[in-house]
């Protein structure tokens, strides 16, 4: 098994792996500073299958991480509650995850990385086209999760 130079595959959460937007009244709940939508979000993928693939990628030298935003205009206290809820969701649903980065809403995601993404060509999987474009402008690789995520990830080891 040939290991690659360590690179990180980062996942966004909301709308990428967690179905925040599919919940009834999610926006009203966020505006009311409730964490229920984050706690109750259903996975958007078969997480057993996804985690199996991610653990295989780890054997090839990839690290797995999450970079996720809080809610727009959230207070400090609400951001803390969101962070806690999202971390629990990741622990319950994405055990392959090795890094967790929580950012206030709108923070450029490349600012969460420990290294300069231009060096390692770290990968971001995000449903937001604008976020993917910004990531790529900083030298990273971006994947649209709506375009056969399993196939895209499997190609990283073939």
Residues of each region from the PLM?
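Conserved Lys-Pro-Asp/Glu-containing loop-to-beta segment of HAD-superfamily phosphomonoesterases
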Residues: 8, 102-130, 135
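Intrinsically disordered, low-complexity terminal extensions
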Residues: 55-63, 149, 153-158
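Acidic carboxylate-rich catalytic motifs and surrounding loops in phosphoryl-/glycosyl-chemistry enzymes
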Residues: 67-73, 100-110, 147
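Structural recognition of alpha->loop->beta junctions
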Residues: 86-102
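Acidic, Mg2+-coordinating phosphoryl-transfer loop and its flanking beta/alpha structural elements
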Residues: 120-156
């Amino acid at each position: 098994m040939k290991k690659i130079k360590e690179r990180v595959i980062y996942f966004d959460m909301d709308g990428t792996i967690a179905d925040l937007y599919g919940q009834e009244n999610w926006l009203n709940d966020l505006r009311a500073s409730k964490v229920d939508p984050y706690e109750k979000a259903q996975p958007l993928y078969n997480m057993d299958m996804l985690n199996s693939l991610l653990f295989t990628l780890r054997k090839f030298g990839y690290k797995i991480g999450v970079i996720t935003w809080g809610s727009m205009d959230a207070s400090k206290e609400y951001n803390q509650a969101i962070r806690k809820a999202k971390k629990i969701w990741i622990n319950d649903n994405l055990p392959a995850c090795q890094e967790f980065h929580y950012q206030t809403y709108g923070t450029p995601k490349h600012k969460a990385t420990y290294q300069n993404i231009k060096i390692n060509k770290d990968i971001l999987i995000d449903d937001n086209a604008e976020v993917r474009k910004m990531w790529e402008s900083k030298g990273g690789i971006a994947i649209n999760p709506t375009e056969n995520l399993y196939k895209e990830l499997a190609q990283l080891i073939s």
